[in-house]
């Protein structure tokens, strides 16, 4: 019957198609478009007709059904049950062999009566293997989520502080090493029940053993679905370690990064919204120093540099060289140039080597002016595959050395946090006790970002006490040398105790705190190991809170909820343009619209007439100067990603970023200086070292726009910028892995600035030597000596303003003919009234501005202010004017300035305006 209806429907369809064909063939369209339109309309009409016919047929059936009685339908259903489902071919064959439903095959029905179950076998594990049974697939397995506690806010507990007398007493006992106990090395953890109950340890080990024979792939897959905090991942940093630091920083109330959280102003450095522009609110704060030990590839450091923002932090790194090295090229949240790596005397980064520890201590001391770092972070660990249960015993020396290094390099009052694993043995607990002696407060905590099924936790130490730390440091150094000696002898002996157990047990409060911590983490670890096992059995399970927890945690930790860009900034076309074109960076920050040719425009040379002005003005106070060491004019430097660009000879020249080591989005005015070294007697020569980059003015420092600040504040910011970029070692590593090489990049320093009232101080810093039958004038900046080729003057107020001197108040004020309504403005209001000149005012001279300036100089015979000018000190064979005349001639020489003439003009001005100098 069904086949017949199908045939009739097909005939009807063919009939309609034929009608359409006939209509089409008889119709003569005027054009192709008309033909297509007519066909479409006819086809639509036919479909509408078919739809109405089918709808009418369907409605008739529906009405017939609704006309019936519900009770009659029910009764009929009871009287006339539906027909049985016909047997399949397989069932008919089975019935022919005597099979009866619900029974098995065989003479006595002994065969199976249910279908063969789907396989629960995992991977290639042998049939019947215990590991296969423990994690066999079970699709009915359901995890009880009520056993977990999932929170966003974490509560940390600080251990009870030790009394001062107790600290001193313990330090006294450490001086003769009588507390150091040597015994046979240990390779079991099961019997360590002094600081955790036997039941908790046994249950944890049993839960761990389930996964010993499970493949890494299955374990990772189960963990990804089971860990409620797994999707937090690494956010926009290079790895998860960065988020651990963010997590710890927040829950410990920002003691790690030492952020000033008042009014949440610190968030202006790293806005949570991408549309908001970052602001360097810590520009005037001291530089923050930190060390990252055993922490390659560098997630801890990337977070800390990002959190501190701009150039407010300087990092030192120490980790194993090779595959576990820092991957600085993956730093995208900040610049790698604020981070300096060091690998110890043996150049291998082994933190357990006593020689390396001593060299690291000396290195950090040199890099921080002997003070040490504000924060040390340590994240050491190594593979213990197959021996996970005794990870604590295998890591004991690593524990010791990381904590020892903190005592070597952290400054007074500084902080420290370090990754630990289990702390069940007297050795580990003794170390923690000694940290309580060295630091004001100590805490043990496992953050959310540390996966709950492992034994990882962190010790956080606040407020180093040098008076006690120095004693403990020397003791732990002796312990480490003893461990090194036993290792080199391949002895089976070991240092088993750092201090007597009875001393630890006598501190009952400490014992209670350690036991409570161990019990809590052991039970929590066991719980999540069982959860992993449950999720491994049923792969359909996943933690439903992962998404919400990620969003809420990032918000609580004050970290933007965004992902790391694929391919870094090189995946963005706009960013690539900035990386390759200095004018893109220039246009981003400079408000002056100018062509590339105008960047090379120069201002008129310095003359004494620049300091001439109607009284009671004090024009000499309007200028600051720096000595120049290069024979040419200062150069504009723009750092734009992979390269830095120097403007020379009317065009930008590219310099490798690795050799200049200046972060992107930086615009500076620099003196490309050659260092001078002394030879025999009075002989001098140019150093063979790469040229030194002397910063003489700054516009943008790693995205921090300082161009509109007063000149002194710009230079102060530049000094901090240089300190953050400072290299303690002359050579740095370029590249990673087998491609790494040591290079000597250009060093950066900030030029010392002087006012004209400080001419005597400047002159006292000069040294005169005869060189090639001419006078060479040398000046010193820090550890460098340069030849003085010129002085560059910068006017610190805008062109339309003049500086006067108040006789009554004995302080300067500003006034302007163009702003007569403003009156006299005291120096305290200059920044508010935008009186200070900007970087662009004194560096970029547009053609129209230069023309206007030259006209003013001609009109006033040179007695007008100049935004910037250069006083050349170079000797010339065509004239006797040079360093000798400049320094020693008592008056202007042939109308050109000398030091004596300059001083005389300043003294005369002071006399007339009645300025009293202290």
Swiss-Prot record:
Positions binding S-adenosyl-L-methionine in this chain are 298, 379
Listed InterPro entries:
G_patch_dom (IPR000467), mRNA_Cap_2O-Ribose_MeTrfase (IPR050851), RNA_MeTrfase_FtsJ_dom (IPR002877), RrmJ-type_MeTrfase (IPR025816), SAM-dependent_MTases_sf (IPR029063)
What residues does the RrmJ-type SAM-dependent 2'-O-MTase domain cover?
Answer: 236-465
Region (Disordered) residue ranges read: 1-56, 62-81
EC number(s) per entry: 2.1.1.57
Q: Which intervals carry biased composition (Basic and acidic residues)?
A: 1-18, 43-56
Tell me, what's a Pfam family for it? FtsJ
**G-patch domain spans which residues?**
86-132
**Active-site feature positions:** 419 (proton acceptor)
Identify the keywords attached in UniProt to this record, alphabetized: Methyltransferase, mRNA capping, mRNA processing, S-adenosyl-L-methionine, Transferase
So what does this one do? S-adenosyl-L-methionine-dependent methyltransferase that mediates mRNA cap1 2'-O-ribose methylation to the 5'-cap structure of mRNAs. Methylates the ribose of the first nucleotide of a m(7)GpppG-capped mRNA to produce m(7)GpppNmp (cap1). Cap1 modification is linked to higher levels of translation.
The name of this protein is Cap-specific mRNA (nucleoside-2'-O-)-methyltransferase 1
